[in-house]
Regions:
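An extracytoplasmic/periplasmic, membrane-proximal ligand-sensing/linker region
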Residues: 38, 163-164, 168-178, 185-202, ...
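N-terminal segment of the mature folded domain
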Residues: 65-119
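Ligand-binding pocket segment of bilobal, Venus flytrap-like solute-binding proteins
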Residues: 70-71, 78-85, 154-235
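Short, well-ordered beta-strand elements
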Residues: 23-38, 56-61, 150-154, 276
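C-terminal lobe and pocket-closing loops
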Residues: 217-280
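Short, polar/charged alpha-helical segment
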Residues: 38-56, 169-171
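A bilobed periplasmic-binding-protein/Venus flytrap-type ligand-binding module shared by bacterial periplasmic
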Residues: 114-125, 256-268, 291-292
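A conserved helix-loop-strand patch within extracytoplasmic ligand-binding domains
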Residues: 101-155
Length: 331
């Protein structure tokens, strides 16, 4: 604790980058520090390991999914986006990979991004709730609706793409006819607050959430089985659309989350590229670190040092032994 302060894409994984193009030296690297916590944490972990372990000069640049991808694709910078959610940029990313401008270095989240409908684990175990159908049979267990005679299904914040998806899942499951009301959480903070409030009151909660996130690191939640396979055609033509004429429940698609680099970086970065190709972690690991960030009001840099001190068993496998020793000496 020394410092507290897509199929086309997969075909072009970095394992196929020619070895002769790489150099043994590291040089100067730019990394996107994306504007959500898990990606910001990853950027700082990369920065510390590359600087302290490999002697690179690393600069962080502010980023977000689409602006960062566009800049990498059109300008060749920054060199590296640690956490790129592929579903958000799938078509242009596939094209950029196919045309040789972007290389997928690794799958940073081994579980992928996970979305779904969740309930508290204690409630699921106490009442035998495993599926969405099980939960919808008990509106009395889920307070929070404006109409107190109904159960609450907490949906996505206003303006988010998942708002329409949740509405259609709500309608497709006939939740309204089963005594539920779809609650507009208004904002991410309000959605988080509804989960925290239910936990503090030992009350039930049902609604949309995703991982990795701090909330799922703080509270033990169970993702419900929707008992419906993912249907790509139904998803694309109806579920994602606000005017879906015939909503039917379908499972959320898996969200591939990759580290992407520019082709120039892949060819010239040498040891840095070797490192990036090996680096990945689980949602449980990230959930725990994000929860620590919230509980300690820590920033990305603080959390990166905490991760390196707490989880040597994870990151030491990403690097050679001599590099690991250099990183440990810097903590």
């Amino acid at each position: 604790m020394g410092r507290f302060l897509a199929s086309t894409t997969l075909a072009f994984f970095a394992a196929g980058v020619p070895a002769f193009a790489a150099e043994d030296t590291c040089g100067t690297i730019t990394i996107a520090e994306m504007n959500w916590a898990s990606a910001g944490l990853a950027a700082w972990v990369d920065k510390i390991i590359l600087e302290e372990g490999y002697g690179c000069e690393v600069g962080l640049v502010a980023g977000d999914t689409m602006p960062t991808f566009t800049s990498m694709n059109e300008k060749g910078e920054p060199d590296l986006a640690p956490e790129l959610w592929v579903n958000a940029v799938k078509e242009p990313l596939d094209q950029a990979v196919a045309e040789g401008r972007i290389v997928i270095a690794s799958q940073i989240l081994t579980d992928g991004g996970v979305e779904g409908i969740w309930v508290p684990t204690w409630l699921a175990e106490e009442h035998g709730i495993r599926t969405l159908k099980d939960a919808l049979a008990h509106p009395e267990l889920f307070p929070g609706a404006e109409d107190e005679s109904k159960g609450a299904w907490f949906g996505c914040p206003s303006g988010w793409a998942c708002q329409a998806i949740n509405r259609n899942q709500f309608l497709g499951s006939d939740a309204d006819e089963k005594g539920f009301e779809l609650v507009d959480s208004g904002s991410a903070a309000a959605l988080d607050g509804s989960i925290a409030r239910a936990a503090n009151r030992n009350e039930g909660w049902l609604g949309y959430y995703w991982a990795p996130t701090a909330i799922l690191g703080q509270y033990d939640m169970t993702r419900l089985d929707l008992e419906a396979e993912f249907d790509r055609e139904r998803w694309d033509t109806c579920i994602v659309k606000p005017d879906c004429a015939d909503p039917q429940v379908t499972e959320w698609p898996a969200s591939d989350v990759y580290t992407a680099v520019t082709s120039e970086f892949a060819q010239k970065a040498g040891v840095a590229m070797d490192y990036v190709k090996t680096r990945s972690w689980s949602n449980d690991t990230v959930n725990g670190m994000l929860a620590w960030m919230v509980e300690n009001q820590a920033n990305n840099e603080d959390a990166a040092y905490e991760f390196l001190e707490r989880h040597e068993e994870i990151w030491a496998d990403w690097v050679p032994a001599d590099v690991a020793e250099k990183v440990k000496a810097a903590l």
